[in-house]
Amino acid sequence: MSACESNDLLKWCVIGAGPSGLTALKNLLQCGIQAECLEREDDLGGNWYFGSSTSRVFESTKLISSKSLTEFTDFPMPHEWPAYPDHKQCLAYLHQYSDYFGLREHILFQNSVTRITPITRNHVRQGWQVDLEDGTTRNYAGLIFASGHNH
């Protein structure tokens, strides 16, 4: 089975719309797997979303790895940017990436996950029930956690 083959026709969930969540979402969709992303903030970017309740960057934050080592292989950072972009450029890059690959329409913003429970039938796991802070519940075939190492 290739990396893009799937026998499951149900939707997958990516939790977190930072760099890892965006790439996970893009790859699922490119493989033809139905997917959506749950993001607790009102916009994407994860840690690079300066000023959000979860961001840990400072006003002066810049990449500590060069853009050539940090950029996604299928979406290079602008050539005219410095070798070590600042946090505003990193966030802009993630927005450009999301727009280029059509990810934004698959992201559900301001959705905090409060609980995850396996869905089982006859003692066999069939998927996952995800409870959200607003009281709604969503069911998924699988989950990818991209919520950062502090969450």
Q: Language-model features: where?
A:
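A conserved short coil-to-beta-strand element within the FAD-binding core of flavoproteins
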Residues: 109-127
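Core beta-strand elements of the Rossmann-like FAD/NAD(P) dinucleotide-binding domain
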Residues: 10, 131-142
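Short hydrophobic core segments
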Residues: 15, 137-151
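Generic structural signal for residues in well-ordered beta-strands
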Residues: 35, 107-109
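Glycine-rich active-site loop/strand segments that organize a redox cofactor
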Residues: 40-42, 47-96
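Short, solvent-exposed loop/turn segments at secondary-structure junctions
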Residues: 20, 42-44, 54, 75-77, ...
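A structural motif corresponding to the C-terminal end of an alpha-helix
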Residues: 101-106
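N-terminal Rossmann-like FAD-binding beta1-loop-alpha1 element of flavoenzymes
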Residues: 4, 9-37
